Amino acid sequence: MLDKNAEKLVEVRARTVEILDDLTISQKLALQALEKCDSKSFEQVKVPLKTINKKANDIDNLILTVCALYSPEAKDLREMIAFLKITSALQRIATNEKNYMKNMGICNPESNEEVKRVIKESLAINRCTIKALEYTIEMITETEDKDRIKDLEAKISVEYSKTDDIYSMIEKDLLQLMHEDHQVNDVYINLMKYIRKNLKIIDRLEDIASRLIFARIGGTL
């Protein structure tokens, strides 16, 4: 039978995975909507995000209660503190996703074909983000196999690196188009800004992975 510390830590992990599941569903809905440039579907993307702040706050309150009542040992305490940071990052990711979909209002049936093409190319970033979310879920649920945990962190880093490369190619493409047109195109400038902001999501996931490594294996942040 699990002691109270272990029992509550299992609950913290499970609740955190629930939030990550919501974020993953939202990302997949966003991907489907943007693949079709179907702005009518954008509102559906926000539905899984509506309860994330409450869920994150509930996790924080649970952690603080455990720390106050049960005096967890150093290893458990380290993981509890890591999850306080993780829930904060997850709330920011939810905000990033909402803002991203608001910005992607430029993807609609009236958008010019060049904008639609660039947005569809940028969705490779979203696919990397979905993979990183799934790896993060696995990192949280894997509590014993340290090699597997390190491997999952490495996979998240690979996905992060891919998104950097994808953005660099998109930026180069749009700058080349403006050069050929001999003018600054505000739509392209904004599009680069929106796509760059979308990178913050996977950046936060990489930070979460680092915190999980610190909590489970140790080292420095």
Where would I find each of the regions flagged by the language model?
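Cytosolic, long alpha-helical scaffolding segments
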Residues: M1-L221
